[in-house]
């Protein structure tokens, strides 16, 4: 079955930088498979714009910072969502694709679906970890889910939601064997000697909560492992400026701050101390021993704890189905505990070999040529709609 030769229109929404990255990957795959005249529009970031995407609103208007911290953004987000729904119903695109940002996109997807516009969602929410009741909203809103992780389709199938496992684009991007020596050369680090990458997050609130603890842990580690060097990526000049007072307060640290290049910094390391998030999956794909940590405001933490199901939060542990790397969260994330755990990860060669095996198996499972698989799934949805037309 062939798609129509008249102009196709695909509406898309990405709500934060990670979604922009995924959506740009999907756009590249779609542009290889759909007519050149296809129009892509909605809400997106710089990576999507590089593919010719027409963004009607700034993506950063949708980027929120947790339950309590997001309250001030709600009125504008609701206004944008209302305008987007009206636009979709007026223009009736061939499909709507929501990329992550479920709290924003599910409502739009339900409106599209109710109007007969196919709704596709890219990135299954972590219903297997917390807020499992969202599966009911997914079943009402989503015609087809594109899943990053292999265990998700079975969960969705039980709720009657069609889905496709497409793998994770990071697994396609990152080589199976990281070039640690080359990364050290690129960053001007010594070829020999222990290196620990420290990643306290990329948001002001994250740095404020966990930054001082991470720096105190680094000071303890340097006392106990005098030859150790640290590398810390700063995603933006603003973040580097935010880190500077902490750097100034610890002049004894053998610390290299890099401008971005977080993947290079992690590749150069022997072990990693990292705030929980997608970056922990990146660290696993780089086959690095790590310690996962986070601190969030008390009320946000209470909400998360009451709605969670799994005993772990780090993606490497979730994918393995067990603790393969330590997690130190909230009040357990003390400088002493973080230093002890990170140095253990650095020094334990048997554990390093075991983790390399576990993470290699994980890498191979997630390496699926995500852009192609996701684009092919979208094309199938468009073809099915064409067949019903």
From Swiss-Prot:
Q: What GO biological process terms does the UniProt entry carry, in alphabetical order? A: lipid A biosynthetic process
**Reactions accelerated catalytically:** a lipid X + a UDP-2-N,3-O-bis[(3R)-3-hydroxyacyl]-alpha-D-glucosamine = a lipid A disaccharide + UDP + H(+)
User: Under which EC number(s) is this enzyme classified?
Assistant: 2.4.1.182
A molecular function (GO) term: lipid-A-disaccharide synthase activity
Domain of life, per the record? Bacteria
Q: Which spans of this chain does the record mark as coiled coil?
A: none
Annotated keywords: Glycosyltransferase, Lipid A biosynthesis, Lipid biosynthesis, Lipid metabolism, Transferase
Cystine pairings recorded for this chain: none
Gene Ontology cellular-component terms listed: membrane
Top-tier EC class:
transferase
Q: In which pathway does it act?
A: Bacterial outer membrane biogenesis; LPS lipid A biosynthesis
Per its UniProt record, what InterPro entries does this chain match? Glyco_trans_19
Which HAMAP family does the record cross-reference, listed alphabetically? LpxB
Report the function annotation for this chain. Answer: Condensation of UDP-2,3-diacylglucosamine and 2,3-diacylglucosamine-1-phosphate to form lipid A disaccharide, a precursor of lipid A, a phosphorylated glycolipid that anchors the lipopolysaccharide to the outer membrane of the cell.
To which protein family does this belong?
Belongs to the LpxB family.
Name the chain's protein: Lipid-A-disaccharide synthase
Please give the organism. Burkholderia ambifaria (strain ATCC BAA-244 / DSM 16087 / CCUG 44356 / LMG 19182 / AMMD)
């Amino acid at each position: 079955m062939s798609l129509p030769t008249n102009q196709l229109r695909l509406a898309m929404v990405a709500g934060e930088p990670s979604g922009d990255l995924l959506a740009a990957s999907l756009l590249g795959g779609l542009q290889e498979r759909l007519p050149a005249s296809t129009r892509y529009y909605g809400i997106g970031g710089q990576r999507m714009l590089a593919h010719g995407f027409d963004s009607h609103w700034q993506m950063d208007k949708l980027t929120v910072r947790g339950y309590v911290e997001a309250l001030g953004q709600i009125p504008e987000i609701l206004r944008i969502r209302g305008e987007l729904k009206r636009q979709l119903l007026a223009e009736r695109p061939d499909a709507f694709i929501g990329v992550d940002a479920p709290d924003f996109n599910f409502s739009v997807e339900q409106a599209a679906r109710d109007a007969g516009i196919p709704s596709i969602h890219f990135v299954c929410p972590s219903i297997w970890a917390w807020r499992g009741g969202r599966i009911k909203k997914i079943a009402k809103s989503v015609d087809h889910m594109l899943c990053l992780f292999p265990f998700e389709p079975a969960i969705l199938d039980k709720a009657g939601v069609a889905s496709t496992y497409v793998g994770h684009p990071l697994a396609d991007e990152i080589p199976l064997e990281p070039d640690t020596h080359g990364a050290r050369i690129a960053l001007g680090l010594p070829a020999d000697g222990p290196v620990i990458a420290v990643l306290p997050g990329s948001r002001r609130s994250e740095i404020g909560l966990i930054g001082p603890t991470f720096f105190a842990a680094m000071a303890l580690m340097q006392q106990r492992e005098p030859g150790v060097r640290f590398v810390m990526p700063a995603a933006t000049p603003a973040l580097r400026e935010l880190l500077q007072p902490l750097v100034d307060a610890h002049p004894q640290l053998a610390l290299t701050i890099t401008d971005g290049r977080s993947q290079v910094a992690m590749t150069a390391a022997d072990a990693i101390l990292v705030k929980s998030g997608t970056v922990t999956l990146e660290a696993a794909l780089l086959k690095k021993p790590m310690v996962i940590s986070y601190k969030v405001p008390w009320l946000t933490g209470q909400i998360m704890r009451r709605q969670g199901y799994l005993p772990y939060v780090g993606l490497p542990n979730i994918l393995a189905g067990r603790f393969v790397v330590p997690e130190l969260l909230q009040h357990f994330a003390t400088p002493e505990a973080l230093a002890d755990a990170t140095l253990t990860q650095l020094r334990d060669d048997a554990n390093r070999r075991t983790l390399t095996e576990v993470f290699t198996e994980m890498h191979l499972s997630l390496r699926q040529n995500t852009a192609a698989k996701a684009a092919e799934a979208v094309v199938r949805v468009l073809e099915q709609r064409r067949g019903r037309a």
